[in-house]
């Protein structure tokens, strides 16, 4: 599990802290039911044998952990996610830095589908992992991409968005998962009534923060649909603990 080392710094880092709790909760849930566990950057351990069989690290991607995730599963390896201990990562502290980082994540996440779609459709991962993958493709990429034009059309025509039931369900599941993840992390320090109220506020704030993904995914989809693969990587600035 990734944890944000500077989580208390500002709104953006607090949002990233809640986001990592949500991601850890979902990732563990996916692996428990035999779904597709994913690598998450720093703190990951990869067997040398597995890396050799998959052809090593891919130099033609900007998110090597996401790319390797697919190649490992296509080669019938499993990825386990450990909730404890957490590996700390310095969160970005500004909207601009967040924009560059999340665009890189979104583009790399998209690119792996484009690179391996034929093998995925051949069910090389197995039925359970393939269905799990398609469900998260729908919720992480397709639905956010469709939600933005749907909302704009709803405003222009003075009607409710067509996708509002699916969007509402996705947001509800996200909030529930985020709260459950935060509770599980907080249990290490003990819980009382005020703790639950604080975690609820963190969940609401984290959900508002997560709305940036709608813009990121939509813009990335539009860009990748008309531009060739470009592998643009903007370095994330880290300052350390001073």
Regions flagged by a language model, labelled:
Residues 1-62, 99, 103-114:
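Long helical/loop segments within the catalytic core of UDP-sugar-dependent glycosyltransferases
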Residues 135-223:
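Membrane-embedded multi-pass helical conduit in multi-pass membrane proteins
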Residues 99-141, 149:
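Active-site-adjacent helix/loop segment of glycosyltransferases
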């Amino acid at each position: 599990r990734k944890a944000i080392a500077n989580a208390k710094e500002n709104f953006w880092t607090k949002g990233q802290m809640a986001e990592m709790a949500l991601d850890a909760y979902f990732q563990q849930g996916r692996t428990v039911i035999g779904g597709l566990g994913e690598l998450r950057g720093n703190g990951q351990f990869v067997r040398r044998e597995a890396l050799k069989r998959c052809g090593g690290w891919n130099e033609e991607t900007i998110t090597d952990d996401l790319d390797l995730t697919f190649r490992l599963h296509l080669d019938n390896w499993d990825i386990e996610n450990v909730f404890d201990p957490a590996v700390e990562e310095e969160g970005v502290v500004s909207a601009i830095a967040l924009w560059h980082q999340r665009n890189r994540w979104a583009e790399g996440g998209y690119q792996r589908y484009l690179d391996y779609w034929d093998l995925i459709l051949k069910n090389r991962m197995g039925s359970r992992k393939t269905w799990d993958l398609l469900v998260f493709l729908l919720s992480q990429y397709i639905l956010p991409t469709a939600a933005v034009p749907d909302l704009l059309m709803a405003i222009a025509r003075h009607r409710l968005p067509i996708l509002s039931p699916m969007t509402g369900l996705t947001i509800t599941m996200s909030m529930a998962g985020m709260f459950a993840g935060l509770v599980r992390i907080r249990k290490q320090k003990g819980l009382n009534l005020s703790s639950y109220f604080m975690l609820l506020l963190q969940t609401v704030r984290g959900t508002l923060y997560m709305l940036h993904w709608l813009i990121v995914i939509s813009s990335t989809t539009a860009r990748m649909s008309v531009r060739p693969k470009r592998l643009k990587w903007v370095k994330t600035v880290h300052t350390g603990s001073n």
